Swiss-Prot record:
May interact with LetB in the inner membrane. Disruption phenotype: The letAB mutant is not sensitive to lauryl sulfobetaine (LSB), but the pqiAB-letAB double mutant is more sensitive to LSB than the pqiAB mutant. Double mutation also increases sensitivity of the pqiAB mutant to caprylyl sulfobetaine. This is Lipophilic envelope-spanning tunnel protein A. The gene is letA. It is found in: Cell inner membrane. One of its GO terms (cellular component) is plasma membrane. Could be part, together with LetB, of a system that transports lipids between the inner membrane and the outer membrane. Contributes to membrane integrity. The chain crosses the membrane at residues 76-96, 121-141, 270-290, 311-331, 351-371, 383-403. One of its GO terms (biological process) is intracellular transport. Induction: Induced by a defect in lipopolysaccharide molecules. The lineage of its organism: Bacteria, Pseudomonadati, Pseudomonadota, Gammaproteobacteria, Enterobacterales.
Length: 427
């Protein structure tokens, strides 16, 4: 018995066209964080690309023209004298008006014999932002004059995390709450300039795509075929072959399989920071003279006294001054041990922890910024005066060393310790 099946006739004509040209192939790229070699397709503007294995951002879609970056830099340069030299806060102490600005706080630190601690604050609040705007201006002028731009481009990517104007702005709020127990506070004209400078700096850093600047100024022929001998440069993120001198053909720094002496430098910085954190938390970090009496505060006791007036601000200072430094030390110690013992479990967790400490590390400088600003506000000789204690130097040095330890660690070593050939990683 035959089955009668109805015929289905399409209502619209289906047209099949042959592909007349070869589909576009992607360029081969190595991930600078996990060293995976993959094919990167062509990316349009405002599109980002991520590593298929570790999800690290390979290409950032946010990109401004150099002219727009230069305009932002010149605007920031105009704001800087007002943000640093004009009063941020006014207080009335014992019937006398006192003005506080950024430069005055750094000068008070240096004047009291601790120039190293003052230079830490100076670099993060004044030096690094000033280098940022002058570097962008150098790129703008240098591109037109045919100057060598490689050193500036190499420095810009590392400079971003040292620009800490946003953290200093939080420190202004913390210092205001600490001082309000002794005097009446009012915002100064410099505060508005400083807030504007923070906003412009944040926007500029978020749109400063150094890798795209490398592509514009020093374009290189990408690798179009897969080759395990391809290496990625950690300076400019170019994937290719080393030249005859073993250097990256684009930025001219040595092109090595792994960062040289990464573990040794990381261990040295980490152990030194552990040693410095002990006096930083045991010795007094601030000293207040009130009517001839002397009151010393460690980091913890200062947080407890701050909690009596504002528990939320005390929580912020606790996280930045105690929780973050010790968390960074514990995480980095764990990561280094996992590399030495070739741990194969929990790779995803370790990668996330490394990215976390990379982002939060700079916030530990908050305590030094609060001390710097408070020193310029309260300084009335023996009637009422505020000065920093010996722990300030140890704390600042420990924070900087932990930042350097994270920067010096080559994250690809975590993958080397893991089993080879993993296309995915999980716990």
């Amino acid at each position: 018995m035959a089955l009668n099946t109805p015929q289905i006739t399409p209502t619209k004509k289906i047209t099949v066209r042959a592909i007349g040209e070869e589909l576009p192939r992607g360029d081969y790229q190595r991930c600078p964080q996990c060293d995976m070699l993959f094919s990167l397709p062509e990316i349009n503007s405002h599109q980002s690309a991520y590593c298929p294995r570790c999800q690290a951002k390979i290409r950032d879609g946010r990109d401004w023209s150099l002219t727009r970056l230069a305009a932002m830099a010149f605007t920031m340069l105009l704001l800087m004298p007002f943000a640093w030299g004009e009063p941020l806060l006014h207080i009335w102490l014992l019937g006398i008006r006192i003005d506080a600005n950024v430069m005055q706080g750094i000068w008070q630190m240096t004047k009291q014999g601790d120039a190293i601690t003052g230079s830490m604050v100076f670099f993060c609040v004044i030096g690094a932002p000033l280098i940022l705007v002058t570097s962008i201006a150098y790129l703008w002028f240098g591109n037109r004059l045919g100057m060598n731009l490689r050193p500036v481009l190499l420095m810009l990517e590392r400079l971003k995390e040292w620009v800490m104007l946003d953290i200093y702005l939080v420190g202004i709020g913390v210092a205001s709450i600490k001082v309000q127990d002794y005097a009446h506070i009012q915002a100064g004209v410099g505060l508005f300039s400083f807030v504007a400078l923070v906003i412009l700096t944040t926007v500029t850093l978020s749109h400063l795509n150094v890798e795209e600047l490398w592509e514009r100024f020093y374009p290189q022929r990408p690798a179009t075929r897969r080759d395990e001998k391809l290496r990625v440069c950690l300076g400019c993120h170019f994937t290719g072959y080393p030249d005859q001198r073993g250097r990256c053909p684009r930025c001219h720094i040595p092109l090595r399989l792994r960062r040289r002496h990464s573990l040794q430098k990381c261990w040295a910085a980490l152990l030194a920071s552990i040693v410095l954190l002990l006096p930083a938390n045991l010795l007094p970090i601030s000293i207040i003279y009130l009517n001839g009496g002397r009151q010393e505060d460690t980091i913890l006791s200062g947080i407890m006294s701050l909690a009596s007036s504002n528990i939320a601000v005390a929580g912020i200072v606790f996280i930045a001054s105690i929780l973050v430094p010790f968390t960074k030390v514990i995480v980095m110690f764990t990561l280094l041990l996992s590399i030495h013992f070739k741990c194969q479990q929990g790779l995803r967790t370790r990668i996330l922890l490394l990215r976390m400490v990379t982002w939060i590390g700079r916030w530990s400088m908050l305590d030094l910024f609060v001390i710097s600003l408070t020193m310029s506000l309260i300084n009335r000789d023996q009637i009422l005066a505020f000065t920093m204690g010996p722990a300030a130097f140890y704390f600042g040095a420990a924070v900087i060393l932990t930042i350097l330890a994270v920067e010096w660690l080559d994250s690809r070593l975590l993958w080397d310790a893991h089993e080879s050939g993993n296309a995915r990683f999980d716990d």
